[in-house]
Curated annotation (Swiss-Prot):
It comes from Clostridium beijerinckii (strain ATCC 51743 / NCIMB 8052) (Clostridium acetobutylicum). This is Large ribosomal subunit protein bL33. NCBIfam families: PRK00504.1, PRK00595.1, rpmG_bact. Keywords: Ribonucleoprotein, Ribosomal protein. The lineage of its organism: Bacteria, Bacillati, Bacillota, Clostridia, Eubacteriales. One of its GO terms (cellular component) is ribosome. Pfam families: Ribosomal_L33.
Amino acid sequence: MRTKVTLACTECKQRNYDSMKNKKNDPDRLEMKKYCKFCKKHTLHRETK
């Protein structure tokens, strides 16, 4: 089952993106490098609760 997750910037802690993830295939926290409009650069975004 796919669940909705929120991705937050690791530098400024802003929650910028929503994504879907399959908990069976990805039990760990999701991490992606994405653009943060608050930092104005590409940063690591991590899954939040």
